[in-house]
Curated annotation (Swiss-Prot):
Belongs to the NAPRTase family. Catalyzes the synthesis of beta-nicotinate D-ribonucleotide from nicotinate and 5-phospho-D-ribose 1-phosphate at the expense of ATP. It comes from Salmonella agona (strain SL483). InterPro entries: N/Namide_PRibTrfase, NAPRTase_N, Nic_PRibTrfase, Nic_PRibTrfase-Fam, Nicotinate_pribotase-like_C. Keywords: Ligase, Phosphoprotein, Pyridine nucleotide biosynthesis. It is an enzyme of class 6 (ligase). Gene3D superfamilies: nicotinate phosphoribosyltransferase. This is Nicotinate phosphoribosyltransferase. Transiently phosphorylated on a His residue during the reaction cycle. Phosphorylation strongly increases the affinity for substrates and increases the rate of nicotinate D-ribonucleotide production. Dephosphorylation regenerates the low-affinity form of the enzyme, leading to product release.
Length: 400
């Protein structure tokens, strides 16, 4: 299946902010590290028939480059260094790093190459896959249907929050990777800009064009890669946390907690990290239990939770965000990142549950265990066992 009308992507910045944040850190600290990453469809969708169309889009991505106005805009942000931005100016996607195949109906994608380059593929490639699939499956759906669905949800949201003090409720768009289309994401974000509680987007292109705050810090791959970069597996998570502070000592300080598990993370998140990081991000497991653990941890360390921020971003929708806000608002600062339930929430359209995750670093396995067993990713069961042993976790979950 080929011949999509035109390139899906129009800007190198059409990606999530944390990709550039991590890329700069990799550029400065791990320039020669090599990685491999793989695509996973967590649902039962047979996406292999789209392999040729995806390959065409991958080839088209080599023509994307940082434009002068984009370079100038990034230069005005406080956390990017000139050496990195000058390098990014010359960056081009290399399609040879991407192998796309149709394996009896199953879509296989493997990415290999220097981490500083491979890191850029994940988000735009997932957005391409999502848009292509929805273009063929739902040709009559689009912006109008997405906005109608959003308006209905906003009516319900207004009723749900009528008696709530919403002055500390902050919502972000995290919807790039599984969006229905680029046009739908832009329309949704532009509509949400009218709401006082909407504070930004993870998409750098939209943030620039719509004068929004770009949102994001780091992803699982930052912690995964350190499992092989660090000489000691048991201290790899602490090494990742320390390296991030080395690159961003006073900014972008929200730490992702579930690469191993929340309990393992908190054992590593002592006073030296907890005092310097601005907060934590939830991405798997029970969000209420996670939030209670985070607050208790801060209190145990003598840190006032109201000086810290908890970011919730796992499978959220507006009602779930309100429920969490009701539970935690008086005890800690809060932000909510909603993705698929904003940018691909259209009647009769089934969103894709797709990811691209790191599987190797410098030729050796890495793993994501998470607080949700179904999200475990690793080929090497022996490495998963070693990881669980290093972090004092029971040997119960299997790698997928």
């Amino acid at each position: 299946m080929t011949q999509f009308a035109s390139p899906v992507l129009h800007s190198l910045l059409d990606t999530d902010a944390y990709k550039l944040h991590m890329q700069q850190a990799v550029f400065h600290h791990y320039y020669d590290v090599q990685v491999a990453a793989e695509f996973r469809c967590r649902g039962d969708d047979l996406l292999g028939i789209y392999a040729d169309a995806i390959r065409e889009q991958v080839d088209a991505m080599q023509h994307l480059r940082l434009q002068e106005d984009e370079f100038q805009w990034l230069s005005g942000l406080p956390f990017f260094k000139p050496d990195y931005l000058n390098w990014l100016r010359e960056f081009r996607y290399n399609p040879a790093q991407v192998c796309v195949t149709n394996d009896n109906g199953k879509l296989n994608i493997r990415l290999t190459g220097p981490w500083r380059e491979v890191i850029m593929w994940e988000v735009p490639l997932l957005a391409v896959i999502s848009e292509l699939v929805h273009h063929y499956r739902s040709p009559n759906a689009g912006v109008d249907q997405a906005l109608d669905a959003l308006e209905s949800k906003l009516v319900d949201f207004t009723a749900l929050t009528a008696n709530l003090d919403m002055s500390r409720f902050y919502l972000m768009d995290f919807g790039t990777r599984r969006r229905f289309s680029r046009e739908v994401q832009q329309a949704i974000v532009k509509r949400l800009q009218q709401e006082s509680w909407f504070v930004g987007t993870s998409n750098y292109d939209l943030a620039r064009r719509l004068a929004l705050t770009p949102m994001g810090t780091q992803a699982h791959e930052w912690f995964q890669a350190h499992q092989q970069i660090s000489p000691d597996l048991a201290t790899s998570q602490r090494a990742a946390l320390a390296a991030w502070l080395n690159e961003y000592p006073d900014q972008l300080g929200i730490a992702l907690t579930d690469c191993i598990t929340m309990d393992a993370f908190l054992r590593d998140f002592g006073i030296e990290f907890a005092s310097r990081y601005q907060g934590l991000r939830h991405d798997s497991g029970d969000p209420v239990a996670w939030g209670e653990k985070a607050i208790a941890h801060y209190e145990k360390l003598g840190i006032d939770p109201l000086t810290k921020t908890l970011v919730f971003s796992d499978n959220l929708d507006l009602p779930k965000a309100v429920e969490l806000y009701r539970h935690f608002a008086s005890r800690v600062q809060l932000s909510f990142g909603i993705g698929t339930r904003l940018t691909c929430d259209i009647p009769q359209v089934k969103p894709l549950n797709i990811v691209i995750k790191l599987v190797e670093c410098n030729g050796k396995p890495v793993a994501k265990l998470s607080d949700s067993p179904g999200k475990t990713i690793c080929h090497d069961k022996a490495f998963v066992r070693a990881l669980r042993k290093a972090f004092d976790l029971p040997q119960v979950r299997k790698a997928s």
